[in-house]
From Swiss-Prot:
Effect of gene knockout: Impairs the production of paxilline.
Function: Terpene cyclase; part of the ATM2 gene cluster that mediates the biosynthesis of paxilline, a mycotoxin that acts as an inhibitor of mammalian maxi-K channels. PaxG, the geranylgeranyl diphosphate (GGPP) synthase is proposed to catalyze the first step in paxilline biosynthesis. Condensation of indole-3-glycerol phosphate with GGPP by paxC then forms 3-geranylgeranylindole (3-GGI), followed by epoxidation and cyclization of this intermediate (by paxM and paxB) to form paspaline.
Organism, scientific name: Penicillium paxilli
This protein's encoding gene: paxB
Protein name: Terpene cyclase paxB
Family named by the database record: Belongs to the paxB family.
Places the protein is found: Membrane
Molecular functions per Gene Ontology: lyase activity
Swiss-Prot/TrEMBL keywords: Lyase, Membrane, Transmembrane, Transmembrane helix
Lineage: Eukaryota, Fungi, Dikarya, Ascomycota, Pezizomycotina
Segments traversing the membrane: 23-43, 49-69, 78-98, 112-132, 134-154, 172-194, 205-225
Superkingdom: Eukaryota
GO cellular component terms, semicolon-separated: membrane
Signal peptide start and end residues: none
Length: 243
């Protein structure tokens, strides 16, 4: 029993499955709000909201677990498909406006579409290889951990490098945090009530990843507040456009 087929779950987990499904819905709501918000912010600020590599890794993960190794849970499948479809809009907006951020690097500016394609295919092959190596159930979770850490580090790095709230907002940060913390809650229930399959979630590496995620995303909120306050003190009415 690898934990991917919910029908194989023990009675203890089946009893709290509605709560687990609620966390999955919360995860979906958080990320769908985040994706829709990123599309809106991208067109409003004429830039991209998610860093390039995290975006490519994230959409590759969704493609793999929607098409190649789909979950047997209808709730998870529904959430993943909604997220994937909206994420295509995020990718389109990112490709449309990415060149505006790379005027200082002509090689990147002229080949941005190719970079997105190659990076997405690279991450997609990596997620598939991981699933074939350790099994879809474990790879599904470890791939999500990789995506989350890339998103957290990439988001903070992008904010600090731009020195501007361009492409970002409190709503994007809060919705991303909601989606990710609901994922943690969902995983926690599986660890507590389905330990036969998910006892590994109590491993040092998983706990380290959780601490890193909470620390970086918490620090992101502080940095965003500081950058936003600085923009207002300088009389900047809106996020600065890229040069």
């Amino acid at each position: 029993m690898d934990g991917f087929d919910v029908s194989q779950a023990p009675p203890e987990y089946q009893a709290i499955k509605p709560l687990a499904d609620l966390f999955v819905v919360g995860m979906g709501v958080g990320w769908i709000i985040n994706y829709i918000g990123m599309v809106y912010i991208s067109f409003k600020h004429e830039t991209y909201g998610m860093s390039i590599m995290p975006l490519c890794c994230n959409i590759a993960w969704e493609l793999v677990y929607c098409l190649v190794f789909p979950s047997k849970s209808p709730v998870e499948r529904g959430v993943f498909w909604m997220g994937l479809l909206i994420n295509f809009g995020v990718m389109y907006a990112a490709i449309t406006f990415s060149s505006r951020e790379w005027g200082h690097a002509p090689l990147v500016e002229r080949n941005i579409s190719l970079i997105f394609f190659v990076a997405t295919m690279g991450f997609l092959s990596g997620h598939v290889a991981l699933a074939l190596e350790i099994g879809p159930a474990l790879a599904y979770s470890w791939g999500a951990v990789i995506c989350q850490l890339l998103l957290s580090v990439g988001g903070l790095s992008q904010l600090l490098c731009r020195g501007s709230t361009r492409g970002a907002s409190y709503t994007l940060w809060a919705s991303r945090f909601l989606g990710s913390t609901c994922t943690v809650g969902f995983a926690g229930l599986r660890w507590m009530y389905w330990s036969e399959a998910f006892g590994w979630l109590n491993s040092p590496l998983v706990l380290w990843s959780l601490v890193v995620f909470l620390s970086i995303d918490g620090f992101y909120g502080i940095c965003f507040w500081y950058v936003d306050r600085n923009e207002k003190s300088l009389g900047i009415s809106g996020p600065k456009k890229a040069n």
